Amino acid sequence: MELLERARQWASHDPDPATASALSADIEAAERGDEEAAARVGAAMNGPLQFGTAGLRGVVGPGESRMNLAVVIRATAGLCEVVTRHATGTPTLVVGCDARYGSSEFAAAACRVASAAGVRVLALPQANPTPLTSFSMLHFDVDAGVMVTASHNPAPDNGYKVYLGGTVAQGDGRGVQIVPPFDAEIAAAIEAAPPADEVPMNDDLIEAVDPREEYVACASALASGEASAREDLRIVLTAMHGVGAAITSRVLSEAGFSNVSLVEAQSEPDPDFPTVPFPNPEEAGALDMAIEQAREQGADLIIAVDPDADRCALAVPDPTSEKGWSPLSGDQTGSLLGEFLASRGMTGSLANSIVSSRLLSRIAQAHGLEHHTTLTGFKWIARAPGLGFGYEEAIGFCPDPAHVRDKDGIATSIVAASLVAALKAQGRSVWDELERLARLHGLHVSSPLTFRVEEIEQIANGMARLRAQPPSVLAGSPVVEVSDLSQGYRGLPPTDGVLVLTEAGDRVIARPSGTEPKLKCYLEVILPVAEGEPLPWDQARERLGAIKGAFAEIIGL
């Protein structure tokens, strides 16, 4: 069917007057020869927005390829059809949303579609953090959950994240994001759903719920150590213009961290994220305002939660840094938290993703704990058998899987603050603890190499070049293993990626991003530390630099 005719049909079934009229206006302009309008129509109708294990995520706008009311309505119709098929008795669904553009409208529509489909709906308060939705999965023992969020994506984006539990998913998958084959089953049901304006909607089975008090109690209970040490810790907290400021401040206060200073300019939800180029605490410059405030106030710790508060970044004083502060990498934080929890008698296993540092496995071994390596994403990490703590290098941490089976930046802030408070009380720093771990287990240094692309085909081309001509030597060390992760790897399900391992133990994993137009390479080198000698940082940086140069040439982006 001709593009403009398909677009015209979509617009005629779009129940949102704003997106329907915007698409219709572009169709009319395109018919008059307006090339820019024609390009916008092409982008809006470039195939249905794909539903996968991450749910939906895309730019907010009109058409089948964007995040909008019509897409959310049809997605919810498909989800409810699948949940009803698998549930025992009346299915239950919890729905939450952040404060991005369209979030509250999308969540309200999801509630009304589910209600009309015979699903009992628990509607969370508007503008809530993702961990509250994750918490609600287990707290209310529901069959499914929807969180409308694009997490730390740029301002124009939104998304639709799906969890399963209750009678639909039990065991290690209860309360966790979807994995295959549920993603394909839901995608097929969405494709079979009627046009959005023909999907029934009502309010009959919607009930407002608010489990914030219960969540605050669980998260604040993760605090440990002397009360005086917690009171003595000076924290600067930023929520990156998201929904996490009030609840994270409350949890820290309930946990005994009374000396918390908010970055006020970033504390109120604002979908434009005006003070940061990207609302991602990992991005360069994202913590500048927090660092400036921390320097002025003589703080001990910066905690940054991302816009939906499921991820947590830390920064600490660093006398070697020009700014006097340095952020910790996800691997540094994950290793510190894993060691901290294990040393305090944590039961259960430690787990991290295949692209995260191998240091956690050595920490687990030292404490007599099981360790599990998983595929990337908490849909896999949270399924690790007997999980006690899990993390991924992209500053996602799960410190309380008994209550939240997903990454949780708010709960993480409590464990991290407890760790830094305990170190301060001993007269030690985070850097001292990282050095201790390096001397015990070897210096593990990880670094990303990221290629952001304009055309998605460039990612596939780069991966194809790597598979066709993998390196034989990296940083002077022979390559001893090249594994295509799409064929499965050491018992893990297949995933798009390539792992390269050298004789020296250097490792690179290349994979496409699941949420952004990026090809990501995850590098890690491990060096032994001689007793009484300085840590071999220069050697590690030299090896990482050589590996980055080689991979940039191979991938060709």
What are these regions (language model features)?
Residues 2-110, 205-235, 243, 491:
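An N-terminal, well-structured beta->alpha segment
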Residues 295, 299-301, 305, 322-326, ...:
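Phosphate-binding and adjacent anionic-ligand microenvironments
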Residues 10, 14-18, 40-49, 158-294:
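Gly/Ser/Thr-enriched, mixed-charge loops and adjacent short helices
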Residues 45-65, 150-153, 239-247, 251, ...:
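Conserved phosphate/anionic-ligand binding catalytic regions in large, soluble enzymes, centered on
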Residues 50-66, 89-94, 112-116, 193-207, ...:
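Gly-rich Lys/Arg/Thr-decorated short loops/hinges at beta-loop-alpha junctions or inter-strand turns
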Residues 94-157, 251-314:
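N-terminal small/polar loop signature for handling phosphorylated ligands or for N-terminal nucleophile
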